[in-house]
């Protein structure tokens, strides 16, 4: 023990030689390491590789950590050895020293060693990638996916609520034919359904654990039954069906499952960027922009312009999305840079992966609670813009042809007159025909 801390020499050495920046190993990863150590202690006892007293002392020490104690005992920087060995040893040292305290308290005169006992049947090279997968699965399932579904459910509700509000569509940021506000929002709803499916599809590969592969994937120094038993124990502890990776050489030498999974997080960030930017455009103005949506006025928008309401939730959301997209590049570079039997960019990769989950989870929750729930349509503005649009001329095209319809639209635009006036003036259409044919209500569904 060093200076009344539970860590030991290897942790202290890492603090000295890797005193870099402020990014620490994420607690989610620390927790996953602890869970592996807990189950390993039990499995090693069951396989008669570890005595009862030591195994129970290790388990008791782990349970203290899983209860939220001893967080200050894990101080290491992300910018350490690329295998995560120093964080694995940090965990081994803390558990060994705490287990020894518990044994002494119970007057049991034996010693728990960080390598010989806590790390038995393991290597940092199979423990750390397994902890990465565990942390990824748990945080995707319990944090990110639920908030995506929450937002998607609200979009579905809004799409039904606004299904009868007809508005002008826009392509290339130019006026297009009509659709309903509900139809527009239904696109956002379906984007999130797709994102959820894509993210969930990666959980199977993340459920493969490298444990039992030890140093290079051969399993040397691990009991032949260790891998299957430890995976079964982790599945019970975490309430998720993990399985032993079928090829340990792949699972040690690559981070492909994490790289692929983060690609779906980047996909979610892309979708959220589009949705947030759409809302910024639709709420712009409000008097001199599109102004079709009213967003909640959560806080003063300007220190100089009274009464200004800014789309701050959209801005926060899109900044988070930018960071996630940047994280994806870092993860891709790290994933592609492993050599031979081991990827040595793992701390970088899992730090960015878990940051992306936190950013998306928190941003989507805020975006939902403080923006989407309170969005309202500005009915008069929507109606005014719909009736002004020259693209309603598209309804005439099937009756008088494309060229004549285009001529009418150009005449209306150049002379500053209504589409109806230009149509009657052209002589191609009577007033009654215009009223019968140019009807936005009939332009929001396929032709019968």
From Swiss-Prot:
The active site is at 172 (proton donor/acceptor), 302. Keywords: Cytoplasm, Lyase, Tricarboxylic acid cycle. GO terms for molecular function: fumarate hydratase activity. InterPro entries: Fum_hydII, Fumarase/histidase_N, Fumarase_C_C, Fumarate_lyase_CS, Fumarate_lyase_fam, Fumarate_lyase_N, L-Aspartase-like. Substrate binds at residues 83-85, 113-116, 123-125, 171, 303, 308-310. It comes from the Bacteria. The record marks 315 as: Important for catalytic activity. It catalyses: (S)-malate = fumarate + H2O. Its EC number is 4.2.1.2. Transmembrane segments: none annotated. Pathway: Carbohydrate metabolism; tricarboxylic acid cycle; (S)-malate from fumarate: step 1/1. The keyword Cytoplasm applies. One of its GO terms (biological process) is fumarate metabolic process. Homotetramer. There are 2 substrate-binding sites: the catalytic A site, and the non-catalytic B site that may play a role in the transfer of substrate or product between the active site and the solvent. Alternatively, the B site may bind allosteric effectors. Involved in the TCA cycle. Catalyzes the stereospecific interconversion of fumarate to L-malate. PANTHER family: ASPARTATEAMMONIA/ARGININOSUCCINATE/ADENYLOSUCCINATE LYASE, FUMARATE HYDRATASE, MITOCHONDRIAL. Belongs to the class-II fumarase/aspartase family. Fumarase subfamily. HAMAP family: FumaraseC. This is Fumarate hydratase class II. The gene is fumC.
């Amino acid at each position: 023990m060093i200076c009344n801390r539970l860590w030991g020499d290897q942790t202290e050495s890492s603090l000295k030689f890797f005193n870099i920046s402020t990014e620490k190993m994420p607690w989610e990863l620390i927790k996953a390491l602890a869970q592996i150590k807990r189950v390993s202690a039990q499995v090693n006892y069951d396989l008669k590789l570890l005595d009862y007293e030591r195994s129970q002392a290790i388990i008791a020490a782990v349970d203290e950590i899983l209860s939220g104690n001893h967080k200050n005992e894990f101080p290491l920087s992300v910018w350490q050895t690329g295998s995560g060995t120093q964080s694995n040893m940090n965990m081994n040292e803390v558990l060994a020293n705490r287990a020894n305290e518990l044994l002494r308290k119970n007057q049991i005169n034996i010693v728990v060693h960080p390598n010989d006992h806590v790390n038995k049947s393991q290597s940092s090279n199979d423990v750390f990638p397994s902890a990465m997968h565990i942390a990824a699965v748990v945080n995707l399932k319990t944090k990110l996916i639920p908030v995506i579904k929450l937002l998607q459910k609200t979009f579905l509700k809004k799409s039904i609520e606004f299904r009868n509000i007809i508005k002008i569509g826009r392509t290339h940021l130019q006026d297009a034919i009509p659709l309903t506000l509900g139809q527009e929002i239904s696109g956002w709803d379906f984007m999130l359904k797709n994102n959820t499916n894509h993210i969930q599809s990666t959980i199977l590969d993340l459920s493969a654990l490298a444990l039992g592969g030890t140093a290079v994937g051969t399993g040397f120094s691990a009991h032949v039954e260790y891998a299957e038993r430890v995976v079964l124990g982790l599945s019970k502890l975490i309430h998720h069906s993990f399985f032993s990776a079928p090829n340990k050489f792949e699972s040690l030498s690559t981070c492909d499952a994490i790289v692929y999974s983060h690609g779906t997080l980047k996909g979610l960030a892309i979708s959220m960027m589009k949705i947030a930017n759409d809302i910024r455009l639709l709420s712009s103005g409000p008097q001199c922009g599109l102004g079709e949506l009213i967003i909640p006025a959560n806080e003063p928008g300007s220190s100089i312009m009274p009464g200004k309401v800014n789309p701050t939730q959209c801005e926060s959301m899109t900044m988070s999305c930018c960071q996630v997209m940047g994280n994806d590049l870092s993860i891709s570079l790290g994933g592609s840079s492993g050599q031979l039997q081991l990827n040595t960019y793992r701390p970088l990769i899992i730090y960015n992966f878990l940051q992306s989950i936190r950013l998306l989870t928190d941003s989507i929750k805020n975006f939902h609670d403080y923006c989407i729930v309170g969005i309202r349509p500005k009915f008069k503005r929507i109606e005014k813009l719909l009736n002004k649009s020259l693209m309603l001329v598209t309804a005439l095209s099937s009756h008088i042809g494309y060229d004549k319809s285009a001529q009418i639209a150009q005449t209306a635009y150049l002379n500053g007159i209504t589409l109806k006036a230009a149509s009657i003036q052209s002589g191609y259409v009577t007033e009654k025909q215009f009223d019968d044919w140019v009807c936005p209500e009939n332009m929001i569904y396929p032709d019968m």
